[in-house]
Amino acid sequence: TTLERRRQLKPLGDKAPLLSRRLWESWWCRESKFNDDQILPFKGFIEDMNTSLSKVGRALGHRVWQSIEYYMSNYPDVLEAQRNNDDASLVKAMKVAFEDQLVQKVMPKLRGIETRGKSKSDSLDKIRTQLVNDDYTIIEDFDLACEFGYGQFIWNSANYLNESDSSVETEFRAL
């Protein structure tokens, strides 16, 4: 990674008006609008992962799953695809939102699992296989967490963000 210099601090533009609570709440989705065919593959993924975690005395609870589903329900690209009745975009957006939640909610629960022996073969290897089979972009980060944690799983990278959407980076650089 090449670090960029900032030679001059530029003043911020005019202060934007505060977002009203009413407007914010109008954006908030209070119910999951996914049908079973849409959400069950993700729920099944977490349940299968939970089976692997049980081999090392770990588990993901109902609240973890519920927070994942509601994060996905409120993800802007998911909401947009639902508004436009665009099934292809919905599937893609759901996968991106779910992958965010794997990193934010699930991977921290794996911290400290031993990366060798039975813990690796009974749990981490099975989880890795799930990630590979469903073509998630966090595999490199998962491998790094297994490799560089001094014998323990320690998630410490976000390389998947570089791969997931280069158009965002292009937009950001244009600013």
Regions found by a protein language model. Give the residues of each.
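C-terminal regulatory/interaction module of P-loop NTP-utilizing enzymes
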Residues: 1-175
